[in-house]
Amino acid sequence: MILAILVGCVGTNTDVYHGYSKSGVISSFNVTALKSRHLEMVNALRLENGRSSLKYSSSLSAASKTHAFDIARQQRAWNYGSDASSAIDRAKIAGFEGLVLGENVSETYEGEYDVLNVWFKSKIGREIILDPTATDLGLSWYQDSTGKVWWVQMIGKS
């Protein structure tokens, strides 16, 4: 009986983007909720590893959005802008006054849970996410006409 009550309390989130094959267009979902879920997942991983929580940065997210669109246009998930800009350059232009510690990028048909899992399993991605000096996180994406999502996550220290 207790198990049934607990399961009822957990509920299900029907507003989760699980990837192109399951739900289609990411833009049909609440952008704020998706970014909040991502921040919560990152903070859970950080807390499990003895790190402090990050806060959402609108300037890092703006820089991430610009880069997501740019790498989609380039058809290449990498850390360089088509104008040869770096993550540091893009964050500065977007108004971030702190230090950019790292940027994770991905091109995939997967959702935010899966892409975070991939980043966390890679040595460099994990180091960026768990940087002990980090204080800020930005996330954005661009979904092209084929359904492919170009994700960009930036971690910084304000």
Locate each region found by the language model:
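A short alpha-helix/helix-coil micro-patch that ends at or immediately precedes a cysteine
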Residues: 15-73
